[in-house]
Amino acid sequence: MTPVVEIELVDRSMSQSNAMLSGLGISPGLAVGQAFVFRDILHDLERYDIGTHQVEYEHGRIERAVERVLADLGLSAERVEAELNTDLALIFRAHEAMLRDPVLTKELREELEQELVNAEQVVKRVFRRWERRFRAMASEELRGRGDDVADLGRQLLQALAGIRTHVLENMPPNSVLVATRLLPSDTVHLSRKSVVAVVAEFGGPASHAALLTREMGVPAVTYVSAACDAIASGDTVLVDGFTGMVAVAPDAETEAGFEERVAEQRASWAAARERCHDPATTLDGVATAVMANIGCREDAVLAAENGADGVGLYRLEQLYLSRKALPTEDELLEIMRSTVEPVAGKPITVRLLDVGADKKLPSVDLSSEVNPFFGRRGVRVLLAYPELLHTQLRALVRLSRERDVHILVPMVTLAQEMKRLRELLVAAMAEVGAKRQPPLGAMIETPAAALCVAEIMKHADFLSIGTNDLTQYTMAAGREDPLVSDYFRDDHPAVLRLLRLVFEAVGNTPLALCGELAGRVDVLPFLLAVGIRSLSVAPPLVPTVKWTVRQIRLK
């Protein structure tokens, strides 16, 4: 965990010249700028003992710090909601909930009463313990929440110290931010007018900072070893968010060549955006549907603006996870109806709720899982909690009366799961008096599902391959784990062979591809060559993917 933060603006005369650093690209794009290095400095926080008569005073300091941080979190959520989207604002709403947790409040009080030390030491010790608990958890997603705990602890210590202004608010224009780790409270202070790219030593593609930088359209590279030591403030830095390469203080020839690539990228993006509403058809006439992944209405608006042919993956998780109580059937229907309104008239694939023990749902206890990624998740949870599934099926059947709705079942492993889902869907139709059955599809996300796809498709109207989890389970490597990041390759031959195997088995059953791989323009020729004709990508990528399809000749 990082206690009180101060900023060290590193400006060394002996920085590395023309050095090439490598990491993991977590937000695509190319950028050139001047390095702005900032790091959290671990201080020997002032420590002093207190008497029992001073406990209330120190506790009052903690309470006031909590209230100040809660106010700041509220402002951060409002800012992100206004400038980016509602889903990302939920990051800060979740931080508010964590800070209000009565268990945390009790532990802070007990630490103060038992140890009789000042408020700063109490906050430091308690949040360090909480961070270690999260870092030790089996679930990759829960381990990632250690960043959230560290962030909150740091903000409380800043509040106790009276630090108000965040240095990132005063970054000069054309800056490449170089940091040890970028936490959500840092990211919210970034300005598109100032920061052109981010380089960090830690933070995976599913981190909150990654989500925020992608939404801002800022190229970002993480897992760059010793970045804060290898790069000095003021250095010219070239950042390739596609390949994860970072060039420091490049020579004139290298910089000129990179500037040409940046200009080409801008020109191609402009051309792609201009034709984003045109069909994506290869040079030899093969049509490909380029759909969008969405999680909220703002995503749907962007998808429509960028020419998406429909919604290939509507995720319901944020809808559920942002609530204190499970939505009723009517509430769920109204939210989904409002969300998909911007893409009216186009096909919409809604994935049933995909949760496990790594995602806490109100009124649903999944905490007993030994390993959430190898336990009950996706369809397994839905079948274990029939009412949770029943509400979704009824709402989706009702929505299908108004929209071209397809229902996608997550994390299917066995054909029996799809058979049971079909039975429950038919029952839900009878209950609401619906005559037309929405197409029911299976998500292929595990090697078992890929190898047994012939049996699964007997009970499915369509299939969708989720390459993120398929890669994770095939390569036995988590996306967030830097120790195995070299193994997490969605273009590895093992993954691509599974894709080919699935396509060869499906025959005339419609098949779509979603996940990070679907937006990889370098892999598009292979995907189209094996027969993929429907791709679902993040809304900002739709124009580029459609433009790339038009440059490909298959025969």
Predicted regions span which residues?
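Conserved alpha/beta-domain cores
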Residues: 270-555
